[in-house]
Regions:
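Residues lining the SAM
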Residues: 44
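Active-site regions of metal-assisted phosphoester/phosphodiester hydrolases
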Residues: 1-40, 48-49, 53-54, 64-65, ...
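Short Gly/Thr/Asp-enriched flexible loops that form oxyanion-binding sites at enzyme active sites
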Residues: 57-58
Length: 256
């Protein structure tokens, strides 16, 4: 048994908290995350796409739940109301939720013991709005970088987006072990965007995560560089998870 400290990470395309029963249940998303009990979680589709574009799981609900804190990226999207006369006043009158959780739907949640050293919100080349989020974290006095991403449906754009993410990592001032995770929209392990990894990273053997009712495709992936050893990995397929989204969450435990 190794004495090295471990880190459990998870990735979850939560589909704006809308389950396969077509009900929006942010509390159900948090319950699924509690079942997994990861130290760091990358969420995709964590913000709404229309109107105020607020968090699909409200900040207040996350705070009340108490297990996680959102990583603050201090960015926000251009919102529909900002294009209208008196938009800010309308937000107040309608009590709209306009506080986003992440960047283009990508968010990171960490447990309270995880330190946050630095953060970045990345713009990705795209046909439709896409982004990624990056956080440099401190876990048991060991630094680790985590990137959350949701790549394009187009293979050509996925490859460009992965290249942009890897270039952003290379430009970082401090070198540290790195984990990429999210919905890659890539059906094949030999897909073009994953070829950009050039052997510098390994894909954790999590398994198929889509569709949650009958998983046949490993669209969601956790990718770690060779400084990290993968101790275990899998798909979380509890009854609650099968209902909460059309994707199942994936997880991996790595040695730091």
């Amino acid at each position: 048994m190794s004495d090295m400290p471990t880190l459990t990470v998870a990735s979850y395309n939560m589909r704006k908290a809308i389950g396969v029963d077509r009900r929006r249940r942010p509390d159900r998303v948090l319950h699924v995350l509690q079942e997994i009990d990861a130290d760091v979680v990358a969420l995709q589709e964590a913000d709404k796409r229309i109107g105020g574009r607020g968090a699909a799981v409200p900040h207040e609900l996350i705070d009340d739940h108490g297990l996680y804190k959102p990583v603050p990226f201090r960015v926000r999207h251009k919102r529909t109301l900002e294009r209208l006369p008196g938009g800010a006043r309308a937000e107040q009158l309608l009590k709209l939720n306009t506080r986003n959780l992440g960047w283009h739907g990508n968010a990171l949640l960490v447990k309270k013991h995880v330190g946050i050293l630095d953060v970045a919100a990345l713009d990705l080349p795209m046909l439709e709005p896409r982004g990624a989020v990056m956080a440099e974290l401190l876990i048991e006095d060991r630094p680790v970088r985590v990137v959350g991403m949701h790549l394009d449906l187009s293979g050509l754009w996925r490859r460009r987006q992965m290249r942009t993410i890897l270039e952003a990592i290379q430009r970082r001032q401090h070198k540290m072990p790195t984990i990429l995770m999210g919905d890659t929209n890539e059906w094949r392990d030999a897909g073009a965007c994953l070829q950009e990894l050039n052997g510098a990273f390994r894909i954790a053997p999590t398994g198929p995560s889509f569709h949650s009712r009958r998983p046949i495709a490993a669209l969601d992936r956790i990718i770690v560089d060779h400084r990290l050893a993968i101790e275990a990995a899998g798909v979380h397929a509890s009854p609650e998870a099968r209902k909460a989204s059309d994707h199942l969450p994936i997880w991996a435990r790595v040695e730091l």
